């Protein structure tokens, strides 16, 4: 995967929130995901586009 394709614009990251909790998201560059600590969900980034659907999110395990 091209490293540039998985980057998230910092300005976009400031605007995006978890659709479930409306809380802030943390960008995990290694996993190419946006993480909602509150909801314990990780939203994938595909071709540089954050997929902000709860049904597409990965549940974060302890």
Swiss-Prot record:
Membrane spanning residue stretches: none
InterPro entries the record matches: Trm112-like
Pfam families: Trm112p
One cellular component term from this protein's GO annotations in UniProt: cytosol
Signal sequence segment: none
Record family assignment: Belongs to the UPF0434 family.
Name of the protein described by the UniProt record: UPF0434 protein NGR_c31900
């Amino acid at each position: 995967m091209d490293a540039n394709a998985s980057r998230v614009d910092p300005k976009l990251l400031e605007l995006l929130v978890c659709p479930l909790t409306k809380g802030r998201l943390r960008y995990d560059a290694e996993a190419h995901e946006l993480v909602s600590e509150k909801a314990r969900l990780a939203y994938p980034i595909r071709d540089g586009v954050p997929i902000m659907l709860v049904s597409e999110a990965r549940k974060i395990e302890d």
